[in-house]
Amino acid sequence: MTTNKLSIVAYNTDKGLYYANNQRDYNKQRVSIYSGILVNGGQPVDSEHKSGWYFLKGEDKITSVKKNQSGGYGEASWKLLDDSTHIDGVIPKVLTPTEADEFEDDCEWYIGQGSKYYAYRGLYKRVQERLPNIEVDVEFEVDYKGHIEYALVENNYKDMKIRVSNGSSWTPKVMEQSLTSITHYYELEELLTPDIVLHNRPCYITQDTTYNIVRNYIKENINPKHARLTSDYDFCLTVKKVIHIKPFTKSTEITKSNGRSYAKPQFKTQTISTKEVEIFEMCPSKKYQNYTPIEGFKGNSLADLVENMKLYLDHLMGVINTPVEECTSCGGLGCTYNKIDDINIRGE
């Protein structure tokens, strides 16, 4: 048995009432309360803190739900296109549908041959006034779940966007995704916690999404003077330090296309002023060769997750973009930099 009754869930706070549709879509997201609905005499006001929820400031109950409904159309008539063609007793200004013997054909209305004014049909047009919308009551029920602290509802990251990199280095593609759409909560937390305050509970971002976030952040913030990407794919990424060294000249033999030397050996020379040392590597959840699968971002709450993500990304780029100098003690056989042993570890 189906019903058109609107089912609402609501929570009281010290500042007003939060309410939402009890119905959910196939993604387990709350269905919006459809347009044209009036709750307590006004349009639903979207909650600033949680999508799919609405807020009644200073109120603690829902007393009425109405919807705007079309008032329909008034009675149709046929009026002269030009009043100057009116002739008393011959060509009236207005014809009723009966006088016009009107009929419909293919969604168009016509004056019928049975009308004595049929000969003047080209002088008329059919008009029908649209009546104002009317408000009608909507049957509803409210499940009041109790009182929650307003501070628990506050969520400053509801509309936060995250830039995520997808595709290989030769087909780069960056997308903006909402933080809430890529954040996951543990099943038990979802079962025990109202969704309006779920952002206060432990959450995480998957390894694969974390990989794409870190990958894009590196690409957008790397300083090419001090580091460069040597592998940039959707299955692995490598960053190497660019180390400026004392320039030296290197000679390389030029060979034939078959790899053999010329009768008189030929050489090309080049000046080497930099060398590269690997500083960071990662891969997504699927292990690739000797790359390290990156761990997903985690947090004790959504705010904590955002803070952990920011701290990690800032720390990572600080390490990657820090200049590295040639070691004066070994004459260029080594280099000095602060090694970060936990570079692939996320905060919890």
UniProtKB/Swiss-Prot annotation:
Keywords: Host-virus interaction, Inhibition of host innate immune response by virus, Viral immunoevasion. GO terms for biological process: symbiont-mediated suppression of host innate immune response. It comes from the Viruses. Belongs to the Caudoviricetes Gad1 anti-defense protein family. Binds the Gabija complex as an octamer and inhibits its ability to bind and cleave DNA. Counteracts the host Gabija antiviral defense system by suppressing the ability of Gabija to cleave DNA. This is Gabija anti-defense 1. It comes from Shewanella phage 1/4.
